[in-house]
Each structure stands twice: as structure tokens, then as C-alpha cells.
A protein has these predicted regions:
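Basic, amphipathic "hinge/linker" alpha-helix immediately C-terminal to the N-terminal HTH DNA-binding motif
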Residues: 65-84
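A short, conserved structural fragment
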Residues: 53-63
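Key DNA-contact positions within bacterial/archaeal DNA-binding proteins
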Residues: 43
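Short capping segments at the starts of secondary-structure elements
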Residues: 16, 26-33
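Basic amphipathic alpha-helical segments that dock to polyanions
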Residues: 34, 49-55
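Pre-recognition alpha-helix immediately N-terminal to the DNA-recognition helix
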Residues: 17-24, 79
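Amphipathic alpha-helical dimerization/coiled-coil segments
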Residues: 1-3, 79-90
Length: 90
């Protein structure tokens, strides 16, 4: 694991909302869908998705759309989600 990966993992682990929201991103999804699954408000979910995008954990595949934006985990995002899933199982 590279130093940058460790920093991103640590950043996600430190925040309960970040930890939980990354677990609900599966395939293509909208902020509304993720908010409904996670139980967090759309405002908080959108804010966290923006932070994830800046950190390179998710990618918005239609950024010019004002509504119905679709997000997908990047390789780094999947790596972090998988690490968190393994941690939960143990």
C-alpha cells in the first residue's frame, strides 16, 4: 500500500459519514439513491461525494448535468471500500 493510499484510507476512516457513504456506492448511482440507502440527507451525501471526487475516490460520469449525476467508485475508492468491508468482517 502506497503512502497516498494510506492517507486516503485514514481520511475516510476518520469520518463516520464518509465510512458509511462509501459502503453504499455500488456501480453507477445518483446522490439521491446513495442518500436513501445510507439514511443521510441529500445535502450531506452530495457534499461528501464532492470531497470523494476531489480525493479521486469517485468519478462523476456526467458532470455537466445539474440533476441526476451518476457516480462510480474509482480504483482507489474500491480499494478503500474493500479494506473497510474486510475490517467490518473481522
Amino acid at each position: 500500500m502506497k503512502g497516498a493510499d494510506i492517507k486516503k484510507l485514514s481520511w475516510v476512516v476518520r469520518g463516520k459519514q464518509k465510512r458509511e457513504i462509501i459502503m453504499y456506492i455500488d456501480g453507477l448511482d445518483t446522490p439521491t439513491g446513495i442518500a436513501k440507502k445510507s439514511g443521510y440527507s441529500l445535502n450531506n451525501t452530495s457534499r461528501i461525494l464532492g470531497e470523494f471526487r476531489k480525493k479521486g475516490l469517485v468519478k462523476c460520469i456526467n458532470p455537466k448535468e445539474k440533476t441526476g449525476r451518476l457516480y462510480i467508485l474509482t480504483g482507489n475508492g474500491k480499494f478503500i471500500r474493500d479494506k473497510l468491508k474486510r475490517k467490518i468482517k473481522t
